[in-house]
Amino acid sequence: MIFSKHLLSHFVDISHLDIEQMCMRLSSMGLEVESAYPLKMPQKVVVGKILSLTPHPDADKLNVCKVSIGSQELQIVCGANNVKANQYVAVALEGAVIPHTKSGEIVIKQTNLRGIESCGMLCSSVELGLPKINDGIMVLDSTAGHLELGVELGNLPLFNDYVIEVGITPNRGDCLSVLGIARELATSYDLRLKHEVDMDNVVTLGLGRVLQILCDEKIEAHLLYRVVEVKQAYLPLDIALCLARNGSLVDDIMCNFLEYGTYMTGVILNAYKLYDCENKDIVLDNGLVAQLRIKKDENGLGAVFAHQKLSIIGVSYGERHFGTRSEIYIIEASYVNPTLIAKSLYKHAIKGDVQLTYRSTRGSNPNLEQGIDFLCRKMVLVSDALVYSGSHNIVQNIDEITIKTTFKAINQIIGIELDKEEIATILKRLNFKLDATCDENFFMVTVPNYRHDIQSIQDVAEEVLRIYGIDNVSSVPLLCSQSHNINNTYFTYKNTRKLAYGLIAYGFVECIHYVFASSQNLERLGFVRLDEDLELLNPITNELDTLRTSLLPAMLDSVKRNENLGFKNITLFEIGSVYSSKREEKSKLALVASGCMQDECYPHTKAVKWNLFAFGTICQRCVGDLSFRNIRDEANAKELLSHFCFTDERLLHPYQSAFVYQKDKPIGIIAKLHPQVATNMDLSEEIFICEIEIGMSDFSLPQAYEFSKYQKSTRDLTILIDKDIPFYRVRQILLEDQIAYVKNIYPIDVYYDKALGEKMALSIRIVLQSDEGTLQEMQLVQAVESVLSVLVREFDAVLRT
């Protein structure tokens, strides 16, 4: 956004303000000043008047001009095609340094051009360091100031100016106009905006006598129409320079007036030729009535129609070629909610006018009278124009944005304590309306209709801070404290991932399946289903009609798919949620191993197949300290199976299945897949499965214990014992008896024979170690005898020799 101090003076008096301080204030308010520089006209460039001109006798494109500069008359040869008598022009006198010519910097000297003496130069805007406004010389008019012959050009108000460029963020569409910048300065410095004076040249003929406007349906747009008759179109110098500086100057004078009105006020302006909107079917006393019809177009956007579509409101101006002849114009001011336009452009991919949609999607000025009155007043002042009395207004209700807040909340957001009166004063200067509520702690803030970016209490607090000055807020260290976010959920997640990483290290592949399952498949494999009243009401497919009660069915299906694809050795695991028959969610770990642990590869000339002990060892290493108890040895086997959602043991091998225990708590099941199930599912027979409840697993941190530095000793015993006694009971009894020096006991071998009857030969190894010294043979013998006596006492064991 580029503007000047001269343009700001149309709306607010800033003559007493220091430009540098004003730029700093704008930047602190969020309108970052990108550049600010004074206009500097070359010395010895003065105001002159062309008294007469005659063609050059020896050049077709040159004219000999007699120019008055007040104190004298000069003869100047000029080649500009727009030079005319009685024009006020910028005259560079002898000795003037002109920096911006095609040849670079030149010094004006008296010279002879094809035999004619020339004592100066008539300057164009570009040669004076100004933006280009035409292809000829720059013609001065009253908008530059009082034109006194011989006065230095730099002393005229239009050229004794500062040019400022600010960066406008996308949310500040209200500042895409000089009026918007003036409002910001008026608020910051507590100044009053200037009131507009009434227009002259308003004819008694009313707008309704020449224009009829029909609105077919409710459109989401606000429109205001006036009629202006332009008898002689002329674009003043100040408008030309202003638009050229912003890169929006075009050849059409009326288009330039419309762009200038929008640039100055932020109101979107358009125009139509009255005669182009003529309706031959309607004739009144004056013999002419133009008709505009406002309705929605094929994309649902408000559009203006006559005999054809003229424009899309807020999106496209339509074709604008007005010319310079005497004409009656219909002036249109419009406003559409920026969100509505942005959504419509995105939805319909409409190609609109870039500059128009740039403004309308960021939020134009909804106060249409400001824009249309400013434009009409400017046209009356600088052109031979008449404004018809009256206007036609199409108004839609605009929902005011109201925000409920407190002074305390605003102070907390800003970070300092401001008085209530100071906050209220700042908001009122910003044209916010404040209303008290029944609760004295709260008040309602009504946002001005041109501030589309204010939506929340944070926005209100930001406005207060902008005007108060962010530099006035002292910097303090940021106080932040991190709350203790480590909870059971975090530990569960970390432990499950640690478990997964361990299994991956052992070659297992993690897989994920649907939480839904087939109820028929669950029943076929011997798993419980959800209670009937808790089943899914609207399953996604017939095959996934219930919630899974086990991870194993889907895991076995994955094994089958992989075997069908040619994979022989398959190791999978999954960590996921399952549900009990009461729809209680649990987290479980399931493992499946199929095929061989290791293929044939030297030095293993034969493949190493999976077995229950190897499979259980990996489970133990990854999950933790586990023990396995034969299902047949458990008195409450049915209850435990039911707890783990099994209806029976049909999935499990009758002789290779066990409950998984951790610290004497049952947490899952490990087994070889029943051969009949493997056959029915067309699977290989060597498949091992395990399912563990993660919620029941112990993931406590490892405990460090003092260990002995003395050597260990081992002794082996072979005893005859009842074959129905599981080894875990033998080990449990021996360790609970706390026999001196006994550190561990584990089985070596077991032997069954008909000759032994109901007995079996169990070989165990006893690990012995002392914390105080190396054990002597006598101590070892005593320890072994103590072990044997416990076995005899508890299990009627007989030492086998």
From Swiss-Prot:
On the tree of life, the source organism's domain of life is Bacteria
Residue ranges of every copy of the FDX-ACB domain listed in the record: 708-800
Name the top EC class. ligase
Q: How is the cofactor bound?
A: Binds 2 magnesium ions per tetramer.
Required cofactor names: Mg(2+)
Q: Which GO terms describe its biological process?
A: phenylalanyl-tRNA aminoacylation
Domain B5 span(s) in chain numbering: 398-475
Identify the residues that bind Mg(2+). D453, D459, E462, E463
Task: Note the InterPro entries from the entry.
Answer: aa-tRNA-synth_II/BPL/LPL, DNA-bd_dom_put_sf, Fdx_antiC-bd, Fdx_antiC-bd_sf, NA-bd_OB-fold, Phe-tRNA-ligase_IIc_bsu, Phe-tRNA-ligase_IIc_bsu_bact, PheRS_beta_core
Per UniProt, residues of the tRNA-binding domain are 39-154
Known catalysed reaction(s)? tRNA(Phe) + L-phenylalanine + ATP = L-phenylalanyl-tRNA(Phe) + AMP + diphosphate + H(+)
Pfam families recorded for this chain? B5 (PF03484), FDX-ACB (PF03147), tRNA_bind (PF01588), tRNA_synthFbeta (PF17759)
So what EC number does this one have?
6.1.1.20
**GO molecular function term, any single one:** phenylalanine-tRNA ligase activity
- Which keywords does this chain's UniProt record carry? Aminoacyl-tRNA synthetase, ATP-binding, Cytoplasm, Ligase, Magnesium, Metal-binding, Nucleotide-binding, Protein biosynthesis, RNA-binding, tRNA-binding
Location of this chain's protein in the cell: Cytoplasm
Any one GO CC term of the record: phenylalanine-tRNA ligase complex
Q: Which PANTHER family match?
A: PHENYLALANINE--TRNA LIGASE BETA SUBUNIT (PTHR10947:SF0), PHENYLALANYL-TRNA SYNTHETASE BETA CHAIN AND LEUCINE-RICH REPEAT-CONTAINING PROTEIN 47 (PTHR10947)
Q: How does it assemble?
A: Tetramer of two alpha and two beta subunits.
Classification via HAMAP family: Phe_tRNA_synth_beta1 (MF_00283)
Per the similarity annotation, which family is this?
Belongs to the phenylalanyl-tRNA synthetase beta subunit family. Type 1 subfamily.
The name on file for this protein is: Phenylalanine--tRNA ligase beta subunit
Species in which this protein is naturally found: Helicobacter hepaticus (strain ATCC 51449 / 3B1)
Its lineage opens with:
Bacteria, Pseudomonadati, Campylobacterota, Epsilonproteobacteria, Campylobacterales
